[in-house]
């Protein structure tokens, strides 16, 4: 264990890549170091400690992590550089070889970074690695963000028992596990007391909530959180379509606090490609969920994830995907190009898509997405929206988000931060922001 006296008057810089779950966990790491006397750096200060929380969902994500690690070491010369997160769990030796790295810490111990910081170790001694076996990760560790925004991220679940053929995340995060409803509700109440007005529920597979807690499931959690006073709005983070039940959708439509905002990973609109991916639903189920949302909440924001160019995605299957999406009432697509990942079952599937075809398919879906997003914006012009105003002064403007996740701007007013306003926007600027 580290002598905590070495932390006195030390400063830390934090870098986070990837998902909302990572942001929640980085905040938890920051709070644990603050309790030891380590404060966050201010602008233009040089840190004593750099913590980089990484992502490894694609090859590009790995590349961005390496770039960020080198950037942190360069901007904070002489600092103790710690790398954690999914990339650190999957490729610790690769990270340890990067110049300037002193500690690589895997998924299980990431929230215990303070216990492994040896600030007195010579900076030229090379990197040490703290990493256990992923299959041994069984404990759920609660995390939540605590930045200056009125929106907080709350981790309710971790890990994944699905083994989609293209994905490495179960190898990085371990088996599915979650907190209890009582634990999550207590944390939401604590966040409310700190002044938060909106909470985003995050995890790797949040719809799988309840593992290890008999009688508890995600629907029960949603209903319990809907009773938390002080929080005006809960957003359901990305949720698998087979776990987004009709009862959750129907409840959300009449709820006091659950936002009409859904993020649902489709991955492909071809049933054959879904089979190759080992996804747990078909296009008929996905369509039924989206159509029910649109029926009960006509102005809900529905974001859909799609991966293009996966192994086995022949041209005819991509066309099936495109035609399926053309008929689906979504609001926006999040399009990802397939990236081959070492150790995944997808590598055994024949028919690899060329980079050029991946790019063409991605561009087609991006155009479709932009058309739908503009349609969504136009449908909301002139409608009354409820906006929670956030921290931040952007050239004299402040930003907020509506219940259905439309960004809204108004002249900066510090007194408005954290307050709620009902507005009827009439103008959309070039950045996709409603102006009030």
Give residue spans per PLM region.
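Glycine-centered loop/turn positions within well-structured domains
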Residues: 111, 162, 207, 242, ...
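Residue-level signal for inorganic ion chemistry
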Residues: 51, 86, 113, 201, ...
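Terminal RNA-binding accessory module
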Residues: 348-436
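Conserved SAM/AdoMet-binding glycine-rich loop
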Residues: 81-82, 90-91, 193-318, 326
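Proteins enriched for Cys/Gly/acidic motifs involved in redox and nucleic-acid/cofactor modification
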Residues: 1-209, 223, 247, 262, ...
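Short flexible coil/turn linkers enriched for glycine and charged/polar residues
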Residues: 147-150, 160-161, 258, 268, ...
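Alpha-helix N-cap/loop-to-helix initiation residues
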Residues: 22, 58-61, 88, 241, ...
